[in-house]
């Protein structure tokens, strides 16, 4: 509606809209494929059969209109004519977001694209010089409040930044998400002391966080995780296994999800620790006592590296319990 009102809704925007609507409509009505063996049907999301019947003809019309060979052929022709563009059609971004997009596009073209293929082939870390430049662009504090050194921009800005940096190399595009996860957790649930300690340094990139959630045999079912943290005086002692942890070697702080109350099943027994650790390298990935791990070699998504991690008596100060309460 905005693009139409401003006279910016042309043929390519219309075709992109109806093609996308057809794709989404087909998935929502027929089932959203979560994996090769799992499909979420509308009924599973609480949609009644009467509501499904009420809208199924309209959805079928949308799917049919956007799935024709003519639509696909014309859209392909228009995209071909725009070869070299980073986006197709008018994105509808306002002036601020358009400036962010252009800034990230230029950085990606100049600093990332020329080197990305070599980083991938050699399975190398993204150089710290690039990480520092990403920090200087404000990426790590993009959505944090100004009082903590952030830029106080919205989630849409983070989407734009992640998308444009990922166009150069997916690992660079994901750098900011580690800080985004930690920043969101600490900002919304941390004590005032934890916010003051971690958020400003996260915003500048002085602290690189990593999310340590998933475990073998549980995957994204975080309510079933088993890694234990037992409080002994003013310290938590952590024991357990984690897997598919992104960029843990060079991280300074782990947002470490653990079970502090084994009597409570599911989410109620879980707590989050802000677990500090020294940075490692390929020769000595985890110098911290009570922490070991091995790299998970992957075909793609390189640059930060994935790891299995084992904790055996790894200690975290009790004051680093997120929010101060289990």
Name each region found by the language model.
Residues 108, 138, 145, 161, ...:
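Buried hydrophobic positions in well-ordered alpha/beta secondary-structure cores of metabolic enzymes
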Residues 174-193, 219-222, 235:
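N-terminal glycine-rich flavin-associated loop
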Residues 205-213:
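A short, Trp-centered hydrophobic/proline-enriched beta-strand micro-motif
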Residues 217-220, 244-247, 262-264, 298-305, ...:
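Short Gly/Pro-enriched turn/cap motifs at secondary-structure boundaries
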Residues 235, 239-289:
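A short core secondary-structure module
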